[in-house]
Amino acid sequence: MIRTVRSHLNVEAHSHAGMTGKNNEDRYAVASFVLDDNNKMPVLFAVLADGIGGHRGGEVAADLAVNHIVQAAAKSDGRHIRDTIEDVIVEASDAIAAHSASKDELKGMGSTCALAWIVGDKLHTATVGDSRIYMMRAGRIQQLSTDHTWVQEAIEKGILTPERAREHPNVHVIRRYLGSPEPPEPDFRLRWFDDEGDQGDESNQGVQLLPDDVLLLCSDGLTDLVWDDEILEIVRSKPSLKEASRSLVELANSRGGHDNTTVILISVPSNFKLTVKNDAGWLPWIIGGAAGVLLILVVGSVLTFGLLRRNSSVTSTPTTRPLFTQTPLLQPTNTPVLPATTATPQLILPIAPTYTPWPTNTLIP
């Protein structure tokens, strides 16, 4: 893919270390692209990582995660998204594990990951850990991702209610993370509708975004302290994504801010209309010429056939293929906010000029 300076969607991000004096171990990156020189399909890529580990371990792990993932996405052609994500998650996890083993003070470090890869108006997501992805549409909010935590498993098995899970001692026990001894499996389930099952959730990858849709990627510093309906109300009531992002973080901090909090908000403009400029050089002329020759051959064949079968007439009934339009109605989620690990400062990839609002992240040697 080719980097571009501006995104075709509205984006705002904000990160805060919290109120306990700890370092910010959250990292994020947002970058815009087009697929290639011949296909100007716009692409937006966003990733958030919440570092795990004492000393500087969480910061280092989150840095490694974001840098590996963003640079791999940038080098890809943007056409084999799932394969690219699966590969880069393993690579990032292995890099974190190797770095952790190289220094005693970094042992046991890891990171969560939540990413959104938007090609045109098609949404693709993947998560590892308890950083979340939400969709807000038509006055409703839906958690698209599934937490990889002990309490989430307990909720699914009916052992805990969502309300009790929030106060459980194991609320911060994560089942999947980058840097684990065995590379984690990225979760491609996209919970667009309720009760679709894992296979149905995965089939929602590539779902179409609509005007005024808002996506939220966030670390658990937000969702530990702010409920889903509160997130929705803030995003709906604020005049801009910038104000909404800051208000979300401020609310978490006002309730103790015991962890780092990072949010990335992505909205589809109200007047959004996808237009793609394709520059293929001589290709259109070649295709046009070939089509012209083919047309002459077809017409000649028809005339010849008509002369030979003057008294015959053949009519064929054209087939019609209905257009499938997917405009899902999101259902409100009753699952409250849970888990936590560690989080940190705002960053952005160091691959080229970034979309103005964010600083540039520095690579770790």
Predicted feature residues:
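PP2C/PPM-type serine/threonine phosphatase catalytic domain
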Residues: M1-I364
